[in-house]
Structure formats: C-alpha cells, structure tokens
Amino acid sequence: MNNGRIVRINGPLVVADNMKNAQMYEVVEVGEPRLIGEITRIEGDRAFIQVYEDTSGIKPNEPVYRTGAPLSIELGPGLIGKIFDGLQRPLDSIKELTKSPFIARGIKVPSVDRKTKWHFIPKVKKGDKIEGGDIIGIVNETPLVEHRILVPPYVHGTLKEIVAEGDYTVEDPIAVVDMNGDEVPIKLMQRWPVRIPRPFKEKLEPTEPLLTGTRVLDTIFPIAKGGTAAIPGPFGSGKTVTLQSLAKWSAAKIVIYVGCGERGNEMTDELRQFPSLKDPWTGRPLLERTILVANTSNMPVAAREASIYVGITMAEYFRDQGYDTLLVADSTSRWAEALRDLGGRMEEMPAEEGFPSYLPSRLAEYYERAGRVKTVGKPERFGSVTVASAVSPPGGDFTEPVTSQTLRFVKVFWPLDVSLAQARHYPAINWLQGFSAYVDLVANWWNTNVDPKWREMRDMMVRTLIREDELRQIVRLVGPESLAEKDKLVLETARLIKEAFLKQNAYDDIDAFSSPQKQARVMRLIYLFNTHASRLVERGIPTKKIVDSMGQLLPEIIRSKAAIKNDELNKYDELERKLISVFENLEKEAGT
C-alpha cells in the first residue's frame, strides 16, 4: 500500500498526493506525528483529508500513511462507565500514559482495556448453527448491565469450538466458527465502521414511552422508545440542564452522552455529578449504565463529526443486545458548524448561511439510525435507540438552517423559550410551539399502566394552555376583570398547571424526578379542580369565590411536587379529599 505526501495544509484540512487507489472515508495517519485523519474527497491521485487532531507543526512533503480501513470503533465489555474523546480513546488511559492532563497528538491507546479479564458464561455449544447477531455468551459487566456477546453481523456457519466458562480478556478467542471452510475466531470484542448503520431484521412502530421523570416531557410532549427529539434554544435557556436530566433519570438501560463542541466545564459537571447519583429505576450508581464521549469546544473541530458517529454506533451495539438505549448529543449545531468550516476549506459551494448543501442528508442519516427494532440473530429480542439532540440556533432564531432542517427529521420538538427562562420557569419548554408525534402511540400505554383518564387529562391541560394564550392579549389590553367567569377560570387553571405541573426544579432532590404515577396524581388534582370549578361557574358562582374558598389548598397542591416523594403517593389522597370537600361545600351553597 503506497504512502502519500502532504502538498497543502489548511487548518484541519490536509491535501495529499500519490494516494492512488485510496478509498472514501479511509483512515490515514498524517505527518510525522501520525495524526488520525479521514479521507473526505478524492480527485485523481489527490486525497482531501479531514484531520481529527491539531495540525500545527506538520509540513508539506511529510508522509501520509494509509491504513486501508474506515474509521471504526471497538465494541465489547469495558465500555460502560468510561469517558472517551471523540475518537473513542479513553481519557483515563491517555492520562496514565502521558502523565499529563492534556491529550498528546498522535497518541494511540486501545478503546477497550486489553488486560482486564471478564467472566464469560457460554450460551451455545459446539456444533450449533450460528449466524450474525446470535448471543453466544454473557459477561456481567456491571451490576446493571449484562453484556451479551454477539456474533459479528457478517459471520455465519457452524460453531467448531467454544471455550468453557471462565475469565478471558477481550483479545482471547472464545469461539471458532467454520464459515464455508474458513475458520473465523470470535472474541469478546468486535470492530465496526462508525458511518455504516448496524443491521437489524425490521423496524417497529414505537409504542412505549421513554419515561424521563420530567413532567412536561413525559406528559405534554412525550417521546417513545426509539424516537427522535430536538431541543433548540438560545444561550442560557437551559438546553444542557434539560439534556443532563434526560441522561440522569431516563428509563433507558444504557445512556450515551456525547458532549459535541460544548464548553468543557459542562462535561466536568457531568463527570463530577454522575459517580454520586443513583439511578431512580434501580437504585444503583448512574455511571454503571452510562458512557460519556467528551469532545469539547477546545478540541479539534473535525472530531465533532466523529464523536456523533461514535456515540450512535455504540448505541446501536447495545440495541442489538436487546436493550433500550438513549443517545444524548449536545449539540448538533456544533457538528454542523464543523461541516461548514471544512466545506469552506474544501472550497465547496455553500448553501444557506454558508452551511454545505449536504447538511440535510447528513442530519437525516444520523436521525435515521434511531428506532425500535427487531434485532438480527437468536434468541428473538427487541431493542431501541432513542436520540435526543440539542440545537443551538444563534440568537434563538428557529428559522436558521440547522434547526429548520432538524425539524424535518425529528418527531418531538422541545423548543426552549428565553422569556420563560428569564421568568425562572424551568424547564423553559414553550408549550405552544412544541409538538410530539408520539402522543397517540403512547396514550394506550399510559391509559393501561398508569391512569385510564391520562389522555383526557392531558388534552384538558393542553386546551387550557392554548386558550390562556388567546386570552392573554385581551387581559393586557383591558385587564382580567372584563373577562367572562369561565375565561377567568381558564386563567386560574392555567396558572395551576404551570406552577404545579410544568415547572420543575432539576436541582431539588424530590422534584428532579417525577414517577409516572406521581405525574398522574398531580394531573388528577388539576383535572378535578377544573371539572368541579367549571360546573360551579356555570351555576353562577364567581371564579374568585372558588379560589378564595380553597384557602391554602392550591398553594399546597403547588408545593406537593417538591414535598411528596415518589413512594408517598398516599399523601395525594388527603389533598384529593380536601379538594372534593371544598367543592361539596360550594355546591351546597349554590344549591340553596
């Protein structure tokens, strides 16, 4: 394989000649430091290479070493709880090797530790017919995750050898498959190219909600397992805190958090918090189900693209094991900016706002890899990849290309409103602009498993919030006194919905995570208030009298979200009794 020679360097873009027979997206090592790069364009024997490390100091005429392989990552036991850079290099291993807090250029460390021994329990026997995706054994990687060892997708045949139960490293052959006369060894670890989606049997309709513990996300704009969501918002509106809440409390088996081009201190917050936090679904430390990819804004721009693909490939790998995985990417705008930067350096024709014309297709490829699937291989199993990505539009302009193109491909839109954030309403998700295409699909799950009136209660809340917005303009002009009594009740109910349900404190021990049952109990209180109060208003009782009769009950309902724990829901029975008692007294008065 012939090596190339550098002819031009322009930031992260390097042009090399003598690259005959090179392949698109082939990984190369650039210059004397052997910096990792990827071929993104070929013209004759010239290759345009995007380099994933700082190119300072390399010179024309230095060699470019070809590898003949695409950008691939290692998949196997040892991924959970790790912190990787954008190229899947473990940061702790780099620190041990270099004795420095900085990532040295050209450093090569294995993604999966070669020395650790894992206890392998075989699940197949010699002579079995196997195919790609079959589970041949398990490794208990953490108390939360049983790592299922899969046959690589391209391998099929007869199992010639399988090791006995015992401790093995990721490089030890644990099985040998006779594939058309060739002996193919299988190890605990496999490699997969990041730009190629992993295969599956069929894509299924997502019908089960991915519970997040955040009330506005679970109830007003729910996301299903295998769904796609975007969180656009201007600086300071709470994107990162909302995504961190998703990563912490979601009911996913595996969470992969990709910090793509965001500030380093945000990743530092994650790394400090996660070891001490407990998973509310299992009670175990969160790090036992989490993988972090740290590719911060001060790291090379080109590596942002790699980090997104690395994250989604790891998510697909755990999906293939039959798990529900969540990929949180913060933020895809930084990836798009990297594409714009490289497109400009390659002198490509720019499209809207300087972004390359292929931006929509890249975003589509990324979101297309989400979904709930029936996996390949035996035994039959189902897994999902849910994708939630932040988008950072400059100045909060949702018409800019990244946000508008993202909207074409996602089914859930959680727009953050800076005016809500300034009013200290968090999460600052605008209930008028947002949408979810999964409401009809997940309503049956909520009605069956949580509360048979869930859909009815949710729709009442949404209708009330929309009507309140219509009334707000009238109130601004002539004041609330001029409204009809039923409209005054709409304003009061909307205030209760916002204060008791939509607002949520991500830093409060009790309020940070709301179980589905707790959410339904709060909704039920609001629904009861609205239903009974509407009847009384129709009978001529003023809204003000109804609210005054409540005394401290409405503030008590508002405080309940941070006062009543998820395992103390019987306390809501008392609030419900008090509420009904007040309305019974008012009805007696109205009847006389």
Curated annotation (Swiss-Prot):
SUPFAM superfamilies: C-terminal domain of alpha and beta subunits of F1 ATP synthase, N-terminal domain of alpha and beta subunits of F1 ATP synthase, P-loop containing nucleoside triphosphate hydrolases. ATP binds at G233, P234, F235, G236, S237, G238, K239, T240. GO terms for molecular function: ATP binding; ATP hydrolysis activity; proton-transporting ATP synthase activity, rotational mechanism; proton-transporting ATPase activity, rotational mechanism. GO terms for cellular component: plasma membrane; proton-transporting two-sector ATPase complex, catalytic domain. Keywords: ATP synthesis, ATP-binding, Cell membrane, Hydrogen ion transport, Ion transport, Membrane, Nucleotide-binding, Translocase, Transport. It comes from the Archaea. InterPro entries: AAA+_ATPase, ATP-synt_VA_C, ATP-synth_a_Xtn, ATP_synth_asu-like_sf, ATP_synth_asu_arc, ATPase_F1/V1/A1_a/bsu_N, ATPase_F1/V1/A1_a/bsu_N_sf, ATPase_F1/V1/A1_a/bsu_nucl-bd. The keyword ATP-binding applies. It catalyses: ATP + H2O + 4 H(+)(in) = ADP + phosphate + 5 H(+)(out). One of its GO terms (biological process) is proton motive force-driven plasma membrane ATP synthesis. It is an enzyme of class 7 (translocase). Pfam families: ATP-synt_ab, ATP-synt_ab_N, ATP-synt_ab_Xtn, ATP-synt_VA_C. Its main location: membrane. It is a peripheral membrane protein. It is found in: Cell membrane. Its EC number is 7.1.2.2. Belongs to the ATPase alpha/beta chains family. Component of the A-type ATP synthase that produces ATP from ADP in the presence of a proton gradient across the membrane. The A chain is the catalytic subunit. Has multiple subunits with at least A(3), B(3), C, D, E, F, H, I and proteolipid K(x). This is A-type ATP synthase subunit A. It comes from Saccharolobus islandicus (strain M.14.25 / Kamchatka #1). The gene is atpA.
